[in-house]
Amino acid sequence: MRYFSIQAKGWIQWGAFGLCALMAVIAITIGFSIQETPARAALPNVPTHLGVASCSGSTCHGRSEADGKIVRQDEIMRWQEASSPTGAHSRAFAILSEPRSQQIARRLGIGNAETAPMCLGCHAENAASRGPRYQQSDGIGCEACHGGSANWIEVHKLGNHANSVRAGLVPLESPKVRASVCLDCHYGSADGGQFVNHRIMGAGHPRISFELDLFSTLMQHHNEDADYAQRKGLTSNVRVWAVGQAMAVERSLSLYSNPSLGTEGAFPEFTFFDCHSCHRRIYDSQSFTPTTLDNPGRPIPVGMPPYNDENMIMLSAAARVAAPALAQKFEADSRAFHAAIAKDRASAVAAANRLRGSAANLASTFQSASFSRAQIFAIIDTISSEAISPRFTDYEGSAQAVMAV
């Protein structure tokens, strides 16, 4: 079901038949929606998700034009825009019915993708407690990111952001908070249905990559103007990018260290490793041409698949400029982690924990850092210079460099 409102200044003239037909369609749609996703009783300490419909009034976020005095008020329209990246979240559930998704589900043997927990963890809101207007078909709705609204929606209507946060609204203006929320689906979490392992990608799922600032920009439904700054403060794009890189490294290492996720049978979980280290052309002829390059950041034996270090490379560039006191330790821990993978899993997990601590320190440092214009250009120069560019030996790291600059 899509959400919209018709404002007083732009009434559309309907004939009696047309109006009756519209009301009938809406009634039928609502009836099917309620049947499709029944309400779930509120659980202790679990905020109830009221659904996108609870935000879609014309005095809230459901206008058809961005003429609100404080916020745009057309956020729902932007969220459901079919032709724009801003509407991607609203399409998350619908995509499960498409042929590619159904083929992936068949290859995995998990039944219908629209009901498989492996898919619903990220293609629908992970809402344990649901109000009567919640619809799973809304995909990733407002509360998937802003948090279940039952405890804060009435406070939110009064316009005091700090009070809304105290009532349970997720403060996504904080780069660390936003990164944590986005990473759950755009990188993975240990919660059910939120980890894309190599089996899922082998069945046809797209590769997973994460860049917080770019993703935030593509998804943005609001304007960061003067009154936004007054309510929430402003955060520079570079700070969002740097914190996102640090927390992506943290999340990756945390999942790798998880004994239930880090291995798959007798093998390591390949999703953590550089895709193109294995997905390369094989030469059997005498005119063999090497398809790999030495990488100074990965002290590993020839022929061993390297860990996917795309976010580590970007974090090194940011740290060298904005946190030089921490950069040396982070890079030493990074090299030690790559080397430990060549030993055994216990050594690799111990090294991963040390590297994760270094990344966490950088995330906290960048969270409060003020990136000057000179530092921003220095980071760009570092990414493209001989200091870092020799580490771009594979697609993943190179793609991160493009997204960064």
Predicted regions and their residues:
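Primarily the internal scaffold of c-type cytochrome electron-transfer domains
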Residues: 39-43, 64-106, 134-140, 148-400
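N-terminal module-boundary/linker segments of secreted carbohydrate-active enzymes
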Residues: 40-57
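N-terminal signal-anchor transmembrane alpha helix
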Residues: 52-70
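Bacterial N-terminal signal peptides
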Residues: 18-29
